[in-house]
Protein backbone atom coordinates (compact mmCIF):
# COMPACT_ATOMS: atom_id res chain seq x y z
CA UNK A 1 0.00 0.00 0.00
CA UNK A 2 2.82 2.39 0.87
CA UNK A 3 4.48 1.81 -2.51
CA UNK A 4 1.20 2.37 -4.37
CA UNK A 5 0.60 5.57 -2.41
CA UNK A 6 4.05 6.90 -3.30
CA UNK A 7 3.54 6.06 -6.97
CA UNK A 8 0.24 7.94 -7.02
CA UNK A 9 1.87 10.87 -5.23
CA UNK A 10 4.67 10.90 -7.78
CA UNK A 11 2.11 11.07 -10.59
CA UNK A 12 0.34 13.96 -8.86
CA UNK A 13 3.65 15.80 -8.48
CA UNK A 14 4.48 15.28 -12.13
CA UNK A 15 1.07 16.61 -13.12
CA UNK A 16 1.39 19.69 -10.91
CA UNK A 17 4.92 20.35 -12.14
CA UNK A 18 3.69 20.05 -15.71
CA UNK A 19 0.96 22.61 -15.03
CA UNK A 20 3.47 25.05 -13.50
CA UNK A 21 5.67 24.94 -16.61
CA UNK A 22 3.10 24.33 -19.34
CA UNK A 23 0.56 26.98 -18.28
CA UNK A 24 2.79 29.94 -19.27
CA UNK A 25 4.10 28.06 -22.31
CA UNK A 26 0.54 27.38 -23.50
CA UNK A 27 -0.28 31.05 -22.99
CA UNK A 28 2.76 32.01 -25.08
CA UNK A 29 1.79 29.64 -27.90
CA UNK A 30 -1.82 30.87 -27.85
CA UNK A 31 -0.89 34.55 -28.10
CA UNK A 32 1.79 33.93 -30.72
CA UNK A 33 -0.51 31.84 -32.91
CA UNK A 34 -3.31 34.40 -32.78
CA UNK A 35 -0.80 37.05 -33.86
CA UNK A 36 0.60 34.95 -36.70
CA UNK A 37 -2.80 34.21 -38.20
CA UNK A 38 -3.83 37.85 -37.62
CA UNK A 39 -6.70 36.85 -35.38
CA UNK A 40 -6.24 39.24 -32.52
CA UNK A 41 -8.07 38.48 -29.33
CA UNK A 42 -10.03 41.21 -27.61
CA UNK A 43 -8.45 43.06 -24.71
CA UNK A 44 -10.60 41.35 -22.10
CA UNK A 45 -10.01 37.93 -23.67
CA UNK A 46 -6.25 38.47 -23.72
CA UNK A 47 -6.17 39.63 -20.11
CA UNK A 48 -8.36 36.75 -18.95
CA UNK A 49 -6.21 34.23 -20.82
CA UNK A 50 -3.15 35.56 -18.99
CA UNK A 51 -4.90 35.52 -15.63
CA UNK A 52 -6.19 31.96 -16.12
CA UNK A 53 -2.70 30.70 -17.01
CA UNK A 54 -1.26 32.47 -13.97
CA UNK A 55 -3.97 31.12 -11.65
CA UNK A 56 -3.39 27.56 -12.85
CA UNK A 57 0.38 27.89 -12.49
CA UNK A 58 0.14 29.51 -9.07
CA UNK A 59 -2.34 26.92 -7.81
CA UNK A 60 -0.13 24.07 -8.99
CA UNK A 61 2.90 25.67 -7.34
CA UNK A 62 1.06 25.93 -4.03
CA UNK A 63 -0.06 22.31 -4.41
CA UNK A 64 3.59 21.25 -4.72
CA UNK A 65 4.41 23.31 -1.62
CA UNK A 66 1.70 21.51 0.38
CA UNK A 67 2.97 18.11 -0.76
CA UNK A 68 6.55 19.05 0.17
CA UNK A 69 5.38 20.14 3.60
CA UNK A 70 3.37 16.94 4.02
CA UNK A 71 6.36 14.78 3.08
CA UNK A 72 8.77 16.99 5.07
CA UNK A 73 11.04 17.28 2.04
CA UNK A 74 13.29 20.24 1.25
CA UNK A 75 13.75 19.32 -2.40
CA UNK A 76 11.87 17.55 -5.18
CA UNK A 77 13.67 16.76 -8.43
CA UNK A 78 11.56 15.75 -11.43
CA UNK A 79 13.36 14.37 -14.49
CA UNK A 80 11.34 15.10 -17.63
CA UNK A 81 13.64 13.61 -20.25
CA UNK A 82 16.90 14.18 -22.09
CA UNK A 83 18.11 17.10 -24.14
CA UNK A 84 20.73 14.92 -25.82
CA UNK A 85 21.50 11.22 -25.41
CA UNK A 86 24.52 9.97 -27.37
CA UNK A 87 26.42 7.04 -25.94
CA UNK A 88 27.67 7.93 -22.48
CA UNK A 89 26.65 11.57 -22.92
CA UNK A 90 23.19 12.46 -21.71
CA UNK A 91 21.89 15.84 -20.62
CA UNK A 92 18.64 15.65 -18.74
CA UNK A 93 15.73 18.07 -18.48
CA UNK A 94 15.20 18.48 -14.74
CA UNK A 95 12.79 20.54 -12.68
CA UNK A 96 13.94 21.36 -9.16
CA UNK A 97 11.46 22.43 -6.48
CA UNK A 98 13.33 23.56 -3.38
CA UNK A 99 13.58 26.40 -0.87
CA UNK A 100 14.90 28.75 -3.56
CA UNK A 101 12.96 27.88 -6.71
CA UNK A 102 9.50 27.57 -5.15
CA UNK A 103 9.46 31.08 -3.59
CA UNK A 104 10.77 32.50 -6.88
CA UNK A 105 8.06 30.78 -8.93
CA UNK A 106 5.28 31.84 -6.57
CA UNK A 107 6.63 35.41 -6.54
CA UNK A 108 6.72 35.39 -10.35
CA UNK A 109 3.12 34.27 -10.71
CA UNK A 110 1.83 36.67 -8.05
CA UNK A 111 3.54 39.77 -9.40
CA UNK A 112 2.75 38.90 -13.01
CA UNK A 113 -0.92 38.54 -12.07
CA UNK A 114 -0.87 42.01 -10.51
CA UNK A 115 0.79 43.45 -13.61
CA UNK A 116 -1.82 41.83 -15.89
CA UNK A 117 -4.64 43.43 -13.91
CA UNK A 118 -2.88 46.80 -14.01
CA UNK A 119 -1.92 46.63 -17.70
CA UNK A 120 -5.45 45.77 -18.79
CA UNK A 121 -6.45 49.31 -17.85
CA UNK A 122 -3.13 51.08 -18.38
CA UNK A 123 -2.78 50.06 -22.05
CA UNK A 124 -6.50 50.17 -22.82
CA UNK A 125 -7.00 50.87 -26.55
CA UNK A 126 -3.24 51.14 -27.15
CA UNK A 127 -2.21 49.91 -30.59
CA UNK A 128 0.43 47.62 -29.06
CA UNK A 129 -1.82 46.05 -26.42
CA UNK A 130 -1.70 42.53 -27.87
CA UNK A 131 2.02 42.82 -28.70
CA UNK A 132 2.76 43.71 -25.08
CA UNK A 133 1.09 40.57 -23.80
CA UNK A 134 2.90 38.36 -26.33
CA UNK A 135 6.26 39.49 -24.94
CA UNK A 136 4.87 39.41 -21.41
CA UNK A 137 3.94 35.74 -21.89
CA UNK A 138 7.46 35.08 -23.20
CA UNK A 139 8.87 36.71 -20.08
CA UNK A 140 6.59 34.74 -17.75
CA UNK A 141 7.55 31.43 -19.37
CA UNK A 142 11.23 32.34 -19.25
CA UNK A 143 11.14 33.24 -15.56
CA UNK A 144 9.39 29.98 -14.66
CA UNK A 145 11.84 27.88 -16.70
CA UNK A 146 14.86 29.69 -15.24
CA UNK A 147 13.59 29.43 -11.66
CA UNK A 148 12.87 25.69 -11.88
CA UNK A 149 15.92 24.79 -13.96
CA UNK A 150 17.66 21.68 -12.67
CA UNK A 151 20.64 22.24 -14.97
CA UNK A 152 22.33 25.35 -16.21
CA UNK A 153 21.32 24.47 -19.78
CA UNK A 154 17.68 24.86 -18.81
CA UNK A 155 18.48 28.08 -16.98
CA UNK A 156 20.15 29.36 -20.15
CA UNK A 157 16.92 28.78 -22.09
CA UNK A 158 14.85 30.75 -19.59
CA UNK A 159 17.61 33.36 -19.36
CA UNK A 160 17.43 33.99 -23.12
CA UNK A 161 13.63 34.18 -23.10
CA UNK A 162 13.69 36.82 -20.37
CA UNK A 163 16.40 38.80 -22.17
CA UNK A 164 14.58 38.80 -25.51
CA UNK A 165 11.30 39.91 -23.97
CA UNK A 166 13.09 42.66 -22.02
CA UNK A 167 14.65 44.14 -25.14
CA UNK A 168 11.42 43.97 -27.12
CA UNK A 169 9.45 45.80 -24.44
CA UNK A 170 12.07 48.53 -24.05
CA UNK A 171 11.49 49.16 -27.78
CA UNK A 172 7.71 48.95 -27.32
CA UNK A 173 7.07 52.51 -28.56
CA UNK A 174 8.42 51.94 -32.05
CA UNK A 175 7.34 55.31 -33.40
CA UNK A 176 10.11 57.05 -31.42
CA UNK A 177 13.84 56.54 -32.16
CA UNK A 178 15.09 56.78 -28.56
CA UNK A 179 13.45 53.55 -27.29
CA UNK A 180 14.96 51.68 -30.25
CA UNK A 181 18.46 52.98 -29.47
CA UNK A 182 18.10 52.14 -25.79
CA UNK A 183 16.85 48.66 -26.63
CA UNK A 184 19.91 48.06 -28.83
CA UNK A 185 22.19 49.18 -26.00
CA UNK A 186 20.43 46.78 -23.63
CA UNK A 187 20.75 44.01 -26.23
CA UNK A 188 24.53 44.53 -26.42
CA UNK A 189 24.92 44.28 -22.64
CA UNK A 190 22.74 41.19 -22.53
CA UNK A 191 24.85 39.61 -25.29
CA UNK A 192 27.95 40.04 -23.13
CA UNK A 193 26.18 38.41 -20.17
CA UNK A 194 24.84 35.60 -22.37
CA UNK A 195 28.30 34.96 -23.84
CA UNK A 196 29.77 34.65 -20.34
CA UNK A 197 27.04 32.23 -19.29
CA UNK A 198 27.46 30.19 -22.47
CA UNK A 199 31.24 29.98 -21.98
CA UNK A 200 30.65 28.72 -18.44
CA UNK A 201 28.37 26.02 -19.85
CA UNK A 202 31.01 24.99 -22.41
CA UNK A 203 33.71 24.76 -19.74
CA UNK A 204 31.49 22.63 -17.53
CA UNK A 205 30.61 20.32 -20.40
CA UNK A 206 34.30 19.45 -20.62
CA UNK A 207 34.19 18.40 -16.96
CA UNK A 208 31.42 15.82 -17.13
CA UNK A 209 29.23 13.71 -19.32
CA UNK A 210 25.89 14.13 -17.58
CA UNK A 211 25.11 17.79 -18.10
CA UNK A 212 25.86 20.59 -15.70
CA UNK A 213 23.24 19.85 -13.06
CA UNK A 214 25.57 17.37 -11.38
CA UNK A 215 28.50 19.79 -11.43
CA UNK A 216 26.85 22.98 -10.18
CA UNK A 217 23.41 22.24 -8.76
CA UNK A 218 24.63 19.19 -6.82
CA UNK A 219 22.54 16.40 -5.36
CA UNK A 220 21.60 17.79 -1.95
CA UNK A 221 19.01 20.49 -1.28
CA UNK A 222 19.66 24.23 -1.43
CA UNK A 223 21.60 25.85 0.19
CA UNK A 224 23.64 22.83 1.37
CA UNK A 225 25.16 21.87 -1.98
CA UNK A 226 28.80 20.80 -2.37
CA UNK A 227 31.07 22.16 -5.09
CA UNK A 228 31.98 19.42 -7.57
CA UNK A 229 34.19 21.16 -10.13
CA UNK A 230 37.97 21.08 -9.77
CA UNK A 231 39.36 24.20 -8.00
CA UNK A 232 41.00 25.65 -11.13
CA UNK A 233 37.88 25.31 -13.26
CA UNK A 234 35.65 26.43 -10.38
CA UNK A 235 37.37 29.80 -10.28
CA UNK A 236 37.02 30.45 -14.00
CA UNK A 237 33.45 29.18 -14.16
CA UNK A 238 32.58 31.29 -11.12
CA UNK A 239 34.09 34.41 -12.69
CA UNK A 240 32.12 33.87 -15.90
CA UNK A 241 28.91 33.43 -13.92
CA UNK A 242 29.61 36.63 -11.97
CA UNK A 243 29.97 38.50 -15.28
CA UNK A 244 26.71 36.97 -16.52
CA UNK A 245 24.87 37.96 -13.33
CA UNK A 246 26.36 41.46 -13.41
CA UNK A 247 25.08 42.05 -16.93
CA UNK A 248 21.60 40.73 -16.20
CA UNK A 249 21.19 42.55 -12.86
CA UNK A 250 22.82 45.85 -13.95
CA UNK A 251 25.74 45.55 -11.54
CA UNK A 252 28.89 47.58 -12.16
CA UNK A 253 30.23 48.08 -14.79
CA UNK A 254 26.96 47.34 -16.65
CA UNK A 255 24.68 49.68 -14.70
CA UNK A 256 24.33 52.23 -17.49
CA UNK A 257 21.55 50.39 -19.30
CA UNK A 258 19.10 50.48 -16.39
CA UNK A 259 17.79 54.09 -16.67
CA UNK A 260 17.64 53.72 -20.46
CA UNK A 261 15.37 50.70 -20.05
CA UNK A 262 12.73 52.99 -18.54
CA UNK A 263 11.67 53.93 -22.10
CA UNK A 264 9.28 50.99 -22.05
CA UNK A 265 5.72 51.16 -20.69
CA UNK A 266 5.32 51.38 -16.93
CA UNK A 267 4.03 47.78 -16.47
CA UNK A 268 7.15 46.35 -18.13
CA UNK A 269 9.39 48.67 -16.09
CA UNK A 270 7.70 47.42 -12.93
CA UNK A 271 7.92 43.69 -13.59
CA UNK A 272 11.29 43.70 -15.39
CA UNK A 273 13.53 46.31 -13.80
CA UNK A 274 11.78 46.77 -10.49
CA UNK A 275 10.77 43.22 -9.60
CA UNK A 276 11.88 40.10 -11.47
CA UNK A 277 14.24 40.44 -14.43
CA UNK A 278 16.72 42.61 -12.55
CA UNK A 279 16.82 39.93 -9.83
CA UNK A 280 17.49 37.02 -12.20
CA UNK A 281 21.24 37.49 -11.94
CA UNK A 282 20.89 37.58 -8.16
CA UNK A 283 18.91 34.34 -8.35
CA UNK A 284 21.79 32.71 -10.25
CA UNK A 285 24.26 33.85 -7.58
CA UNK A 286 22.00 32.51 -4.83
CA UNK A 287 21.61 29.18 -6.60
CA UNK A 288 25.40 28.81 -6.68
CA UNK A 289 26.01 29.92 -3.10
CA UNK A 290 28.11 26.84 -2.37
CA UNK A 291 30.49 27.85 -5.18
CA UNK A 292 31.28 31.19 -3.54
CA UNK A 293 31.89 29.46 -0.21
CA UNK A 294 34.56 27.30 -1.84
CA UNK A 295 36.25 30.28 -3.57
CA UNK A 296 36.81 33.12 -1.04
CA UNK A 297 38.27 35.45 -3.68
CA UNK A 298 35.04 35.40 -5.69
CA UNK A 299 32.96 35.84 -2.53
CA UNK A 300 35.04 38.93 -1.72
CA UNK A 301 34.52 40.14 -5.30
CA UNK A 302 30.75 39.78 -4.91
CA UNK A 303 30.76 41.77 -1.67
CA UNK A 304 32.82 44.59 -3.19
CA UNK A 305 30.82 44.56 -6.42
CA UNK A 306 27.53 44.70 -4.57
CA UNK A 307 28.55 47.55 -2.27
CA UNK A 308 30.09 49.47 -5.17
CA UNK A 309 26.90 49.10 -7.19
CA UNK A 310 24.78 50.24 -4.24
CA UNK A 311 26.96 53.34 -3.76
CA UNK A 312 26.88 54.18 -7.47
CA UNK A 313 23.11 53.72 -7.64
CA UNK A 314 22.60 55.96 -4.61
CA UNK A 315 24.69 58.77 -6.12
CA UNK A 316 23.10 58.40 -9.56
CA UNK A 317 19.58 58.19 -8.16
CA UNK A 318 20.01 61.38 -6.14
CA UNK A 319 20.28 63.49 -9.31
CA UNK A 320 17.50 61.89 -11.36
CA UNK A 321 14.51 64.01 -12.34
CA UNK A 322 12.29 61.20 -13.66
CA UNK A 323 10.33 59.15 -11.12
CA UNK A 324 10.86 55.86 -12.98
CA UNK A 325 14.63 56.40 -13.10
CA UNK A 326 14.65 57.23 -9.39
CA UNK A 327 12.80 53.99 -8.63
CA UNK A 328 15.09 52.02 -10.94
CA UNK A 329 18.19 53.21 -9.11
CA UNK A 330 16.50 52.64 -5.75
CA UNK A 331 15.88 49.06 -6.83
CA UNK A 332 19.50 48.78 -7.98
CA UNK A 333 20.68 49.90 -4.53
CA UNK A 334 18.86 46.96 -2.99
CA UNK A 335 20.13 44.58 -5.69
CA UNK A 336 23.67 45.65 -4.84
CA UNK A 337 23.07 45.07 -1.15
CA UNK A 338 21.60 41.62 -1.88
CA UNK A 339 24.72 40.70 -3.88
CA UNK A 340 26.90 41.90 -1.00
CA UNK A 341 24.87 39.73 1.38
CA UNK A 342 25.50 36.72 -0.85
CA UNK A 343 29.20 37.57 -0.87
CA UNK A 344 29.45 37.49 2.93
CA UNK A 345 27.89 34.03 3.02
CA UNK A 346 24.22 34.66 3.82
CA UNK A 347 21.55 32.67 2.00
CA UNK A 348 18.08 33.08 3.50
CA UNK A 349 18.46 36.80 4.24
CA UNK A 350 19.23 37.65 0.57
CA UNK A 351 16.25 35.54 -0.51
CA UNK A 352 13.89 37.38 1.84
CA UNK A 353 15.47 40.69 0.77
CA UNK A 354 14.87 39.78 -2.89
CA UNK A 355 11.19 38.96 -2.32
CA UNK A 356 10.59 42.11 -0.29
CA UNK A 357 12.34 44.40 -2.76
CA UNK A 358 10.48 42.89 -5.73
CA UNK A 359 7.08 43.39 -4.08
CA UNK A 360 7.86 46.95 -2.97
CA UNK A 361 9.18 48.06 -6.37
CA UNK A 362 6.20 46.60 -8.18
CA UNK A 363 3.85 48.63 -6.00
CA UNK A 364 5.94 51.79 -6.40
CA UNK A 365 6.20 51.51 -10.17
CA UNK A 366 2.49 50.97 -10.73
CA UNK A 367 1.76 53.94 -8.46
CA UNK A 368 4.26 56.17 -10.28
CA UNK A 369 1.84 57.37 -13.03
CA UNK A 370 -0.53 58.65 -10.32
CA UNK A 371 2.15 60.55 -8.39
CA UNK A 372 1.22 64.03 -9.64
CA UNK A 373 -2.48 63.32 -9.13
CA UNK A 374 -1.80 62.16 -5.56
CA UNK A 375 0.27 65.27 -4.83
CA UNK A 376 -2.38 67.64 -6.16
CA UNK A 377 -5.09 65.84 -4.20
CA UNK A 378 -3.01 66.16 -1.03
CA UNK A 379 -2.41 69.86 -1.72
CA UNK A 380 -6.14 70.38 -2.20
CA UNK A 381 -6.83 68.64 1.10
CA UNK A 382 -4.26 70.81 2.90
CA UNK A 383 -5.41 74.01 1.21
CA UNK A 384 -2.02 74.95 -0.22
CA UNK A 385 1.25 73.76 -1.75
CA UNK A 386 3.24 71.05 -0.02
CA UNK A 387 6.52 72.34 1.43
CA UNK A 388 9.79 71.25 -0.16
CA UNK A 389 12.04 68.95 1.92
CA UNK A 390 14.30 71.14 4.03
CA UNK A 391 18.05 70.73 4.33
CA UNK A 392 18.18 70.11 8.14
CA UNK A 393 17.06 66.54 7.47
CA UNK A 394 19.70 65.05 5.13
CA UNK A 395 19.44 61.64 6.75
CA UNK A 396 15.70 61.45 6.09
CA UNK A 397 16.22 62.50 2.46
CA UNK A 398 18.97 59.90 2.06
CA UNK A 399 16.70 57.18 3.43
CA UNK A 400 13.96 58.16 0.97
CA UNK A 401 16.38 57.88 -1.95
CA UNK A 402 17.73 54.59 -0.62
CA UNK A 403 14.36 52.87 -0.27
Model regions: which residues?
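...captures the hydrophobic TM-helix bundle architecture rather than a specific catalytic motif
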Residues: 2-403
Amino acid sequence: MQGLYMEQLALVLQGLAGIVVLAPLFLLVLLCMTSLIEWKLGEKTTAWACLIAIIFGLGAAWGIVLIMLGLDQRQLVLIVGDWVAMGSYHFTIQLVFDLLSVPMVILTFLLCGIIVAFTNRYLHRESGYHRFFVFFALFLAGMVVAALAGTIEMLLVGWEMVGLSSVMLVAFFQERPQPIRNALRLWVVYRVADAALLLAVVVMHHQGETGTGHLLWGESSWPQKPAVLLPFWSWWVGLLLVIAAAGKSALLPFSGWLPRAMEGPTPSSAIFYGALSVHLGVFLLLRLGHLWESIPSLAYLLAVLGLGTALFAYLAGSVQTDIKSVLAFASLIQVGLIVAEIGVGWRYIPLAHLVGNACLRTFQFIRAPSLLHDRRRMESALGGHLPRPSEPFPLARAELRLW
